[in-house]
Swiss-Prot record:
Coiled coil, from the record: none
Cofactor note: Binds 1 [4Fe-4S] cluster.
Source organism superkingdom: Bacteria
Organism: Stutzerimonas stutzeri (strain A1501)
Binding site for Mo-bis(molybdopterin guanine dinucleotide): 85, 152, 177, 181, 214-221, 245-249, 264-266, 375, 379, 485, 511-512, 534, 561, 721-730, 805, 822
Domain 4Fe-4S Mo/W bis-MGD-type residue range list: 41-97
Alphabetical UniProt keywords: 4Fe-4S, Electron transport, Iron, Iron-sulfur, Metal-binding, Molybdenum, Nitrate assimilation, Oxidoreductase, Periplasm, Signal, Transport
Listed name of the protein: Periplasmic nitrate reductase
Length: 834
């Protein structure tokens, strides 16, 4: 039997994924049913439920149940391949502890913060929520309520939540868990280009001559893209791969230039590369003269800790962290002079010859370079700077916005781009890159939403880490989370998160599908529908918007987050939540509910249920009497059309395997800012960074600054946290798939063998990781897939029984407010010897 190259790649990827997960190939076969005629299954397309790659899958249903999935061969992203998590998508929905009814803490038949969870009806759940919301609004105004959402919200769920909070309740205290993963990338894009999200696409992989991974373990975190990268590397001998990290991981297996650097010194390396480009005469002077300008960013900006922290008191520019002053090219050249090869090698610990080889990849005009990064860059107290500095390198050489030359920020959630960033569910944002602080943007939003002037507040709300602090301090009284598990995923759990959730003055609601750590710490649990139990849309890392139909119904009384948000809006009259002065501008709203004003407003409700594709259910449309998803999407699309965020018409996406915005005349855009690809670039200009008023990108002069916390005599180790291939984020879905759980049942403490010997422990010994904030126990691993250098330990955060985030520090980037989960100081105590 002969195989085509694609068939071989698919078979090989399946073999690798199965081997990594510790299972035989045969065990994957039950999830790879492909002959519909022989099985009497109904197959439909959907994007994968996991990471931001946006793989397409085919979903098989029978008797109102998902029974199988396989990679979609028609999907451009993955071309029929799935990673090991994707192969088990059909099993994530049917854990034995699936939530199927609302649960309220009760004692003696009524709510009690110290009571036990008891089943209640949806009406009872909304009754207590209504009571708590109205009391909080009366006592503290809009600032007293908050919402924490997700990059796993569908586009219309995030859009509905944004409307309900920012317009309905007039509170900007809504933030997504993407604050923990993508905020630094978003601010980096906005500062450099004036627009968010990558300019390139996945086709860059097949066109590049070199790949540089900055703090990204693509082999495990984006394995399908890694398959494409590996194919490019192995099929083209001239292609090089450079991998940089603070510890060795599986992506190093393909590295031509492997580099382990000291934590935080990626900033030094980035400036060295820029300096090398200039000193070696490799600057594309024509490009930078025409398309860039230079600026010096504010420095000594602090670490996003509480204002009373000594580090914040020393920070001179914490209040103006996101500011800069214009400088010239020669000023930038002078700024970079201290960042020599010798200095970079000394600070980073990377051998000089490897640093120079890396710099030469960027400097060589004949080499097309694709830079990839994710959490190693973004979860960083200077993450925005790191993003700006990688753009500096691509701009200095002109290696940008063309096939193969691409700085590419990878995303970790299926709609961190499509929902958190594009919809604007951050506490400071509005749709299509607009901001609550901009009067023009607020006016545009109020016009599209048909609301009176002054409805939207101008002050940004509390960001994710600050929400936890405000709950603890009693400022936030009511808090609703959806599709997120912050009690496990957030930093400094014991000191800053748990106290706020269990504060007697607060009321916390968690909408989820399983009893997560967060759900168990809440006061009210709402059972949610998941994935294909509802009609949905995600936006992936390459700006690709993808739709799916509802394919099955949710179990029991579980309801979609969209239904929960919209149904709850019926509980409030406008005159109950808006001040009289605002209501006087729209007297016709008096006695109307937030549902009437936000969702039954003549445009969201303008599409009838007759427009739902034949053969598909839609619970929300049936409940509200109109095609809610289509109405929300078409209203949302008004923000971007004509403003370089164009989306196609709703029905187009149900036909296509996704389209990359801007979509003009139903034609997607692969490379932004480049003439011939991007319809917004003016003829004859070649390249235009039109997000900024002068249509130029900014090259930033930004220095190295030390981390918030470093090892010392008492706490001599670095701690870095992250993920593993088999589990996704907090493991609330993947831990319920037997094959994945058995493959990796526990979070291990990855340690250098020499450090283990010094502690008199060995592989399998139990140790305690202790920081100034908390502690966690785990088994030592000295021979596993992750190989830290001496002085650093690595622990994944998927394990709900081993909460490593009890140990982490809640320091954030002062600009993006994104948490640094990669660097804090710990000590290791021996519990038992294996």
């Amino acid at each position: 039997m002969s195989l085509t190259r694609r068939q071989f790649a698919k078979a090989n990827a399946a073999a690798i994924a199965a081997t990594v997960a510790g299972m035989p190939i045969a065990s994957t076969a039950s999830n790879l049913v492909t002959e519909a005629d022989a099985t009497n299954l109904k197959w439909d397309k959907a994007p994968c439920r996991f990471c931001g790659t946006g793989c397409g899958v085919m979903v098989a249903t029978r008797e109102n149940r998902v029974v199988a999935t396989h990679g979609d061969v028609k999907a451009d992203v993955n071309r029929g391949i799935n990673c090991v998590k994707g192969y088990f998508l059909s099993k994530i929905m049917y854990g034995t502890d699936r939530l199927t009814q609302p649960l309220l803490r009760m004692k003696d038949g009524k709510f009690d913060k110290q009571g036990e969870f008891q089943p209640v009806t949806w009406d009872q759940a909304f009754d207590i929520m209504e009571e708590k919301y109205k009391a909080a609004l009366k006592a503290g105004g809009p600032e007293a309520i908050g919402m924490f959402g997700s990059g796993q919200w569908t586009i219309w769920e995030g859009y509905a939540a944004n409307k309900l909070m920012k317009a309905g309740f007039r509170s900007n205290n809504i933030d997504p868990n993407a604050r923990h993963c993508m905020a630094s990338a978003a601010f980096g894009f906005m500062r450099t280009f004036g627009m968010d999200e990558p300019m390139g696409c996945y086709e860059d992989i097949e066109a590049a001559d070199a790949f540089v991974l900055w703090g990204s373990n693509m082999a495990e975190m984006h394995p399908v893209l890694w398959t494409r990268l590996t194919d490019r590397r192995l099929s083209a001998p001239h292609v090089k791969v450079a991998v940089m990290s603070t510890f060795e991981h599986r992506s190093f297996e393909l590295a031509d230039i492997p580099m382990i650097f000291n934590p935080q010194t990626d900033l030094v390396i980035l400036n060295y590369i820029a300096n090398h480009i200039i000193q070696s005469g490799a600057v594309n002077k024509e490009f930078i003269d025409k398309h860039t300008r230079f600026a010096k960013g504010a420095t000594n900006i602090g670490y996003g800790l509480r204002p009373t922290d000594p580090l914040e008191l020393k920070a001179e520019n914490a209040a103006v962290a996101n500011t800069w002053t214009d400088i010239g090219y020669e000023d930038y050249v002078e700024f970079l002079k201290p960042y020599t090869l010798e200095h970079a090698a000394k600070e980073s610990g990377v051998p000089a010859e490897r640093l120079k080889a890396l710099a030469e990849l960027y400097a060589d005009p004949k080499v097309k370079v694709m830079s990839f990064w994710t959490m190693g860059f973004n979860q960083h107290t200077r993450g925005v700077w790191a993003n700006n500095m990688i753009y500096n390198i691509h701009l200095l050489t002109g290696k940008i916005s063309e096939p193969g030359n691409s700085p590419f920020s990878l995303t970790g959630q299926p709609s961190a781009c499509g929902t958190a960033r594009e919809v604007g569910t951050f506490s400071h944002r509005l749709p299509a890159d607009m901001a609550v602080t901009n009067p023009k943007h607020r006016a545009i939003t109020e016009k599209i939403w048909k609301l009176p002037e002054g409805t939207i507040q101008e002050k940004p709300g509390f960001h994710a880490v600050d929400q936890s602090r405000k709950l603890k301090d009693g400022v936030l009284k009511v808090y609703w989370t959806q599709v997120t598990n912050n009690m496990q995923a957030g930093p400094n759990v014991m000191q800053e998160i748990l106290p706020g959730w269990r504060n007697p003055e607060t009321f916390v609601i968690v909408s989820d599908v399983y009893p997560t750590v967060s759900a168990q710490a809440a006061d009210l649990i709402l059972p949610s529908a998941m994935w294909v139990e509802k009609e949905g849309a995600y936006g992936n890392a390459e700006r690709r918007t993808q739709f799916w139909h509802q394919l099955v119904t949710a179990p029991g009384e579980a309801r979609s987050d969209l239904w929960q948000l919209v149904e709850f809006s019926k509980r409030f009259r406008v005159d109950e939540v808006w001040p009289a002065e605002l209501l006087s501008k729209a007297p016709e709203f008096k006695d109307k509910t937030l549902f009437d004003v936000l969702f039954k407003n003549g445009q969201v409700d303008r599409f009838s249920n007759d427009e739902i594709a034949e053969g598909y259910a839609n619970y929300e449309a049936e409940a509200f009497g109109f095609y809610l998803q289509k109405g929300l999407f078409e209203e949302y699309a008004e923000f971007g059309r004509g403003h370089a965020h164009d989306l196609a018409a709703f029905d187009v996406y149900h036909r296509e395997r996704g389209l990359r915005w801007p979509v003009v005349d139903e034609k997607e855009t692969q490379w932004r800012y480049r003439e011939g690809y991007d319809p917004y670039v003016e003829a004859g200009s070649g390249v235009q960074f039109y997000g900024n008023a002068d249509k130029k990108a900014i090259i930033f002069a930004l220095p190295y600054e030390v981390p918030a916390e470093v090892p010392d005599e008492e706490y001599p180790f670095w701690l870095s946290t992250g993920r593993v291939l088999e589990h996704w984020h907090t493991g609330s879905m993947t831990q319920r798939v037997d094959e994945l759980h058995k493959a990796v049942p526990d979070a291990l403490v990855y340690m250098h063998p020499e450090d283990a010997r010094k502690l008199n422990v060995r592989r399998g010994s139990v140790v305690k990781i202790v920081s100034r904030r908390g502690e966690m126990q785990g088994r030592v691993e000295t021979r596993g897939r992750n190989k830290p250098p001496m002085g650093l330990v690595y622990v994944p955060f998927f394990d709900a029984n081993k909460l490593i985030n009890k140990v982490t520090l809640d320091a954030t980037d002062p600009i993006s407010k994104q948490t640094d989960f990669k660097k804090c100081a710990v000590k290791i105590e021996v519990v038992s010897i294996a």
